[in-house]
From Swiss-Prot:
Taxonomic lineage: Bacteria, Pseudomonadati, Pseudomonadota, Gammaproteobacteria, Enterobacterales
Protein name: Erythronate-4-phosphate dehydrogenase
GO terms for biological process, alphabetical: 'de novo' pyridoxal 5'-phosphate biosynthetic process; pyridoxine biosynthetic process
Enzyme class, broadest EC rank: oxidoreductase
Keyword line: Cytoplasm, NAD, Oxidoreductase, Pyridoxine biosynthesis
Keyword Transmembrane found: no
Family to which the UniProt record says this protein belongs: Belongs to the D-isomer specific 2-hydroxyacid dehydrogenase family. PdxB subfamily.
Known function: Catalyzes the oxidation of erythronate-4-phosphate to 3-hydroxy-2-oxo-4-phosphonooxybutanoate.
Amino acid sequence: MKILVDENMPYARELFSRLGDVQAVPGRPLPRDLLAGADALMVRSVTKVNADLLSGSAVKFVGSATAGTDHVDDTWLNANGIAFSAAPGCNAIAVVEYVFSSLLMLAERDGFQLRDKTVGIVGVGNVGRRLDARLKAWGVKTLLCDPPRADRGDAGDFLPLETLVRDADILTLHTPLYLDGPYRTHHLVDASVLDAFADGRILINACRGPVVDNAALLEALQRGKKLSVILDVWEPEPELSTDLLARVDIGTAHIAGYTLEGKARGTTQVFEAWSEFIGTPQQVALSSLLPEPEYAEVTLTVPLDEALLKRLVHLVYDVRRDDALLRHVAHQEGEFDRLRKHYQERREWSSLHVICADADSADCLNALGFTASVRGAR
């Protein structure tokens, strides 16, 4: 069997070669002639999978090593007998840690304590619920908005978006992109929402670019709207607005989910789905793939506070690096995708073992996603 894999899917060649002949291919653009004779196609979010790409091909399985699936026309795939599997939740921890790192950076810069803020989370799926749990572990008040879950009667105190816009100091978006329908999220944050969002607040988009009307956001900032803005996703990509980038506080190249662990989870999830599809199910232990991190262990001699948490977080990942990289090259054609293709290895907080002086600090760090223990009790 011939299996095409995105050249930027870590461990893909290593894993899929167990089950067939593997060819690494570019994700954007993906030339149609490379599909000749292929039985399966493994992609990331940069590849639009639809009739234009696959009609007339022999592909019978598509795997997307991503949490989101708006780049895949799964209706067309189903109608044409092509199986599809994605990797829901694979990069959720990475996105949560991106948001947390960004907020701690703003807190240090602007002189506030994150625990004193109220965070409104829009979209309480794989990312949103994990972010909610970690913020609460740090003592941060959260407000949740998720109309589909509210209408289904899911457990949770869900509020209208208008309430979050009114009451939250920080609004962070973690929804799928729905272009229409009762739960439309395209331009969910538009000019009217921006007008209602008070000055001095923080807006974060790390889900899909068009969830925020980028033109309306740029216009609001140009008119003097006093918002701190964190954007990892843009409208459109990869041709983002450099004028908007110049006005946001943190801007990155759609890399919030790009931890080594998150990428590896995505690859292993679609590999396991493919192995089941062909009748040879296999399970992969993530730990068997990952290398030793650059920083594996650190010892604390004092109790944990927000300044110390920020230092631990930024020891593993400092979002300012990615912000600086995008600003340096954003005006150059093709550099947005190049940054993503050649992204520097980034680990999750769990890769760092923190030896604490007290049990309360260790308990808190474990709840936040680190690997922590008390000195002498390891």
